[in-house]
């Protein structure tokens, strides 16, 4: 993710093609990077079955912690896919307080627990320290459902299970 990664890799790929070189590893890198965004939505759909009408909270909107940069942020692509599927989306990010008009349907919470209030599932998208350090018991108390999709593999499966949450990571 991030604003430059895809553009930089695509530039390298194009340069290679100009010289008659097929950079299959670069093409695969682009495909995998873009596919991770769809993976989060697929995991939600696998667990929840139907996304229409489901309430989903996205934790972390920027492409990485420590920035306010939303250019090519995975969270925005995930939000777009969820909205298209008919989900109701809320979000929280420590520095993002407002999204562009395109994402007017996304409710921005004042904190992670506010964004997660009465949701069916939470998706950790960006590993901000305050989001990776979230209290699983407090999170579960405000949620309607118990599903947490951890796209950063930052959470402890044991701690989340002890709090009554079903944690789904990436790569497992």
Where are these regions (language model features)?
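Structural/interface elements that position substrates and couple domains in central-metabolism enzymes
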Residues: 1-172
